[in-house]
Amino acid sequence: MNLVRTAMLLAFMTALFMFVGFLIGGRAGMMIAFVIAAGMNFFSYWNSDRMVLSAYRAQQVDERNAPEFFRIVRDLARNAGLPMPKVYLYDSPQPNAFATGRNPENAAVAASTGLLSALSAEEVAGVMAHELAHIQNRDTLTMTITATLAGAISMLGNFAFFFGGNRENNSNPLGFVGVIVAMIVAPLAAMLVQMAISRTREYSADRRGAEICGNPLWLASALGKIARGAAHVPNEDAERNPATAHMFIINPLSGERMDNLFSTHPNTENRIAALHDMAQSGMNVSTSPARAANPSRKSRSVPDTGLGRGGSQPPKGPWS
């Protein structure tokens, strides 16, 4: 079913891309847009995960430089019956995380240094279980391709003003009005698609993530902390790449952006309430992150992934 939804998404995004091309350059513009969209669809399938990880300058970590974090992901993946995903950290003070990849065999999970600083090991386990649930539900392909194409469509809508605003250009059937329509409609339509695919999937990933980690309250507690952190700590890379916002466990964009007029995520309080209801329904809860993980608290630093921005060291945290 996810394959059908992904195909429908690609078809819609391609049609939207062609529509903007038509408004800019008539039939010729529409055909050029079709060729570009077809190439982007092919490229996105194979490379969109790398593009997203690169946009956040995420660095891959392993058991040598992030032993406890890596072990938590490994044990959770075992609980879920998933292949071990690649594990990444990206330098950002905002606590957040996302998953990407075209299938479970080629998946990756990424967490911010701020997440490891702000959350306990149990809460981190809840977050990573949520991301593994997205991988298991095969949401990551759709979410990653949407991020790539939505960003391209928004950019095309902005470029429409510069490349399609020539009143003497007879190839544009709607003239300057059509260009204005493209500037407004294209980014809005892309944002609505992001909302549609993200909101319904977050609840499903929350539920499955709670089952994977064994305790819904870990994820509930983590969501509260991440939401408060995201509200006060900006994510500069996300602000520059708002099309990726729906990939994160909590919307990383600040409230100052118009992008937040239509949220890509369901209300955090409702998600937390659903997890509390799940815990109260009698679900067997675990007391340690994942089945085989029992993180020690001897380490007091975030795993070393190199210098942070401006040559500074990443912020210190309660565990690694």
Curated annotation (Swiss-Prot):
Binds 1 zinc ion per subunit. Its EC number is 3.4.24.-. The active site is at residue 131. One of its GO terms (cellular component) is plasma membrane. The chain crosses the membrane at residues 6-26, 28-48, 145-165, 173-193. Its main location: membrane. It is a multi-pass membrane protein. It is found in: Cell inner membrane. The gene is htpX. Residues 283-320 are annotated as: Disordered. Zn(2+) binds at residues 130, 134, 202. PROSITE patterns: ZINC_PROTEASE. Belongs to the peptidase M48B family. Its cofactor is Zn(2+). It is an enzyme of class 3 (hydrolase). InterPro entries: HtpX_protease (IPR050083), Pept_M48_protease_HtpX (IPR022919), Peptidase_M48 (IPR001915). This is Protease HtpX homolog.
